[in-house]
Amino acid sequence: MAETAEDLAEKKKKRTFRKFTYRGVDLDQLLDMNMDQ
């Protein structure tokens, strides 16, 4: 489990984005919708 600070920062970033919601819609879903349109 030897992780560099960069690896941890990347994980934290992904975790934050995964939790981020806009009006109850997951950020991932918003991004997918924007790409589809």
Swiss-Prot record:
Single GO biological process annotation from the record: translation
UniProt keywords, alphabetically: Ribonucleoprotein, Ribosomal protein
Alphabetized GO MF terms: structural constituent of ribosome
Origin superkingdom: Eukaryota
Disulfide bonds: none
Record flagged with keyword tRNA-binding: no
GO cellular component, one term: ribosome
Tagged with keyword Ribosomal protein: yes
Annotated InterPro entries: Ribosomal_uS19_SF
Family: Belongs to the universal ribosomal protein uS19 family.
Protein name (database record): Small ribosomal subunit protein uS19
Lineage of source species: Eukaryota, Metazoa, Spiralia, Lophotrochozoa, Mollusca
